[in-house]
Design a protein with these regions (language model features):
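Hydrophobic alpha-helical segments
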Residues: 29, 34-40, 120, 137, ...
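Non-heme Fe(II)-dependent double-stranded beta-helix
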Residues: 1-14, 18-114
């Protein structure tokens, strides 16, 4: 899959792309593979299971499942990565999560080298429950806006009032 010129321009300006249904035909097997990693992890982790009280994370994640790992080479993902990063891009890491509550806004990367994050949401999410919120332009590391944003609103406490006098969930963002 090659991105269109419009998609590339959109990404360069806003810092994100959204592909709902891109893996619609594969999502059942992706979900089963995701769940199997958790079953395997729980059996080797003194039986600890996600109890729904706090976020649970496994890192690295897809590396533990041959099928999920093969998605890195799937033409849909590889095409996106190649178009944005070039043919010599490097896969760095993966994580699998069960989320609980809100996650405060944060920047995933602060490296000067162009990076992307590709995420699969296996549960239904809405703008009010669980979705990813993207602040357009926040991806431009070193940019005045991105720097001011990071200095002003990065918090680990979702109930903390920001320097702007608003709650973290009130920061203007695009809900995906």
């Amino acid at each position: 899959m090659k991105l269109t010129e419009q998609q590339i321009r959109f990404f360069d300006i806003f810092g994100f792309l959204h592909f709902p249904g891109l893996f619609a035909n594969d999502i059942d097997y992706i979900t089963k593979s995701f769940e199997q990693i958790w079953v395997d992890h729980n059996s080797s982790n003194q039986g600890k299971v996600h109890d729904g009280n706090i976020r649970s994370t496994i890192v690295p994640f897809i590396d533990q499942n041959e099928y999920l790992c093969s998605l890195i080479d799937d033409q849909r993902l590889d095409g996106i990565a190649t178009t944005i990063l070039g043919n010599d891009y490097n896969y760095v890491s993966s994580d699998g999560n069960f989320y609980v509550g809100d996650t405060p806004w944060h920047s995933d990367f602060s490296r000067p080298k162009k990076t992307i994050k590709i995420a699969f949401y296996l549960d239904e999410v809405t703008k009010d429950a669980g979705c990813l919120r993207v602040i357009p332009g926040s991806h431009k590391i070193g940019d005045v806006f991105a720097t001011l944003l990071k200095e002003t609103i990065v918090t680990r406490d979702p109930n903390e009032t920001l320097l702007l006098g608003i709650q973290p969930n009130e920061v203007p963002a695009v809900a995906l």
